[in-house]
């Protein structure tokens, strides 16, 4: 907030009074997405104070995937189906004809403290093996795969590939894929003033690179076509992200595939480009 008082401008940050939050049932791919967001908001040149406060106060209970989701490919990205880190507690659900149990893995001191107050017992070796077998079976049954070998160079070298025209003919530029992606962080800023001009507020809200206005500079948009906007999104996610943050921007959750109204599948788009190069 900015306020003009006695000829001087006073700028004050808005206090974040949100309560601590607990996230239940967080999937392994989303744990990796949170780690990616940490790189963006906590480990760059500038730290986001609001994100940092909420992140430090969050309590995360993850759940390992006991069956593959319809559009996920986390096994290809190395982000699932087992939670490796980033959780306070991680659960593995084991269902048999006679029992319904949860294996619990402690990830932090906060998680250990919570577990102390809950009835539990030490897992038997056979139960641990049963949980691991369930997770391995999930990985083997995953229906989609993405070949990530040399993917950055593949996309950089095919910036003018005709496949971009093919996908642009189908893409509605609705932005669904970016809005449901757990690693997309783009936003816009809006300045609001009162009628007297003595007070102003700056609000940050989510935005997506599929809108024409997102890349608007003086004179017009630098990405005026669906081709250029989809190419930017996919190339940034799978290639440029590695240069910026040292990791992929895709965690293989498959939400972009699920929520695309015309059925665009990024794994198929990458495969088509790769196969054309091999032929």
Model regions and ranges:
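Active-site-flanking alpha-helical
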Residues: 34, 182-186, 261
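Ferredoxin-type iron-sulfur electron-transfer modules in oxidoreductases and energy-metabolism complexes
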Residues: 148-169, 187-279
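A donor-sugar binding/catalytic signature common to diverse glycosyltransferases
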Residues: 176-192
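Iron-sulfur-associated redox domains of electron-transfer enzymes in respiratory
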Residues: 1-156, 164, 195
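Short, flexible micro-motifs
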Residues: 28, 178, 257
